[in-house]
Amino acid sequence: MARWTVNTSVLRLPVTDHREWDADESERRWRKWVSSKDPSEWGAAEWRKYKKRFLVYDAEDPYKFESYKLPVVDIVDGEPKVIRRGVIAAQQALAGARRGVDLPEDVKERATKLAEKLRKKSDKALEKEED
């Protein structure tokens, strides 16, 4: 049985607004950043690194791609950064857009709160950049 967990570690990452959000392209960059190994050879260290990209993951079964939902992080200049448009896409999915996201309601609520915090963090970063 899945044990969906909200990944608050994304709050420690820097935020940027300077990138369009393409989840598929981002996924390719992310996997390359995680490891040069084929994902079938990944161990616990690679999966811990992979987890940093997502708002929600299944802590019961963290060793498969289906255990991760709502990506918001990409690689920018060789470093992981929260992408503002990725956060917006996650918020929309949590609100039901694009067929929504299949998660228990309590997890959706916590993920929504986390996404709101990330959005506020990105708003502040954007304000600083505009000054």
Place the predicted regions along the sequence by residue.
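Extended terminal accessory/targeting regions
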Residues: 1-131
